[in-house]
Amino acid sequence: MEIKIKALNSVNTLASTTISADAIKSSVEKLAKKAAKTMKVDGFRQGHVPVAVVLKRYEKELTNDAEQDVLRDVVEEAIKKAGKKNDDLIGEPIVSKFDRKDDKIDVELTVSFKPSVDVSGYESLIPEFSNPRVLKKDIDEKKAELLKMIAPLEKIDGKRGLKVGDFAKFDFEGFVDGVAFDGGKAENYVLEIGSNQFIPGFEDGMVGMKVGSEKDIEVKFPENYGAANLAGKDAVFKIKLHEIQERKIPEKLDEEMLKMVLPNEENPTEELLEERIKEQIRQEKIYKLINEELKPKFAEAAVEKFKFDVPKNIVEQEIDMQFRNAWSSFTPDDMKKFREDKDALAKKRDEYRKDAENSVRLTFIIDELARVRGVKVSDQEVVQAIYFEAYRSGQDPKAHLEMYRNQGMLPAIKMSMIEEKLFSELFNKEKDEKKASKKEKAE
């Protein structure tokens, strides 16, 4: 089998060849002989199934396997002829032609390799910025929010009606078309009015109710409601209000509250709490600054400065993803056109190509920067992050991890964590200032 190769650029190579029907037939026979040694077929002892029987029963599957084997041979030869190694290969080859004819198969495919990336001089691309300031009013507002969260609930004595901000203890049962539905009933449920935890109209309908009163509230489930059997349906909830509670927010934190918000401190004080709040706000502001301003500026400058060829197959995957994300925004006519007209589809995909190439290029730049700066994320850190996400959303952590593993998402999550860690380090002005100070003292 003679294979011709053509270098499209430094990382993409086009390979073409013609596979004879005899080569496929020979490969099919080899696979059939191998399968006959282990296959179980009724009427024959295991390991004694005639090859002719295997061929007759599984010819289609064996032919597919043989063609895949031959394609792998083409890829192996293309790698050698391109002067590369197997480790240089990235992703799956793009098979652009596989034309079956009577006595041959014409094959054309593109293999892609990892690019060589040089990020020398990246330091000059880091945008100038000042560490965000934390004002006293920011700390006071955060502390007030904290006080509100931990303040105890107290039962309201009197006959006033329920208002926004109150906590209602009540029974409810929901009905659609006069029939109670699963999950629509609870007793002594506590709900903050105005928190929007329930569907639109529910909490508003309770405002003004008094303790001991009953009311029917008419609502409509949102069209995108999670339970398909309720989405878009009109419903009636029968309500009975038992208690009205409100938070009694203290003017100042007492010792018990300080221990609650600073559980690991031997001597929790309000001053220490304010320091922690200040640091939390500072980190939030830095995170916002990095993600909304610094990172986009750095990424744009890096893609412009570091030019290199990118793997075609990875770019096509990125285009696939961008196209899928945009699909719901297309008109029905456009969707029909893209399904039926290959040229129109190809033209539309090309609109995403430049952004896709830049996105892939940035991924390789980030990967190299992480290597240069020694930024790593262990598999254990990935698992911990997934577990934390599960705990926060009330899900089973092991099942959550398994879901990501089955979806093949773990490498992407790890890359995302490396990226976040890298940019946090790149834009850590305080760390750089400390390094500079140490260097000056040493000199």
From Swiss-Prot:
InterPro entries linked to this entry: PPIase_dom_sf, PPIase_FKBP_dom, Trig_fac, Trigger_fac_C, Trigger_fac_C_sf, Trigger_fac_ribosome-bd_bac, Trigger_fac_ribosome-bd_sf, Trigger_fact/SurA_dom_sf
UniProt GO MF annotations: peptidyl-prolyl cis-trans isomerase activity; protein folding chaperone; ribosome binding
GO biological process: 'de novo' cotranslational protein folding; cell division; chaperone-mediated protein folding; protein transport; protein unfolding
GO cellular component: cytoplasm
EC numbers: 5.2.1.8
Predominant place of localization: cytoplasm
Domain of life, source organism: Bacteria
Reactions accelerated catalytically: [protein]-peptidylproline (omega=180) = [protein]-peptidylproline (omega=0)
Subcellular localization(s) per the UniProt record: Cytoplasm
Record-annotated PPIase FKBP-type domain positions: 165-250
Keywords: Cell cycle, Cell division, Chaperone, Cytoplasm, Isomerase, Rotamase
Family membership: Belongs to the FKBP-type PPIase family. Tig subfamily.
NCBIfam families xref list: tig (TIGR00115)
Role: Involved in protein export. Acts as a chaperone by maintaining the newly synthesized protein in an open conformation. Functions as a peptidyl-prolyl cis-trans isomerase.
Domain notes: Consists of 3 domains; the N-terminus binds the ribosome, the middle domain has PPIase activity, while the C-terminus has intrinsic chaperone activity on its own.
Protein's recorded name: Trigger factor
Annotated gene: tig
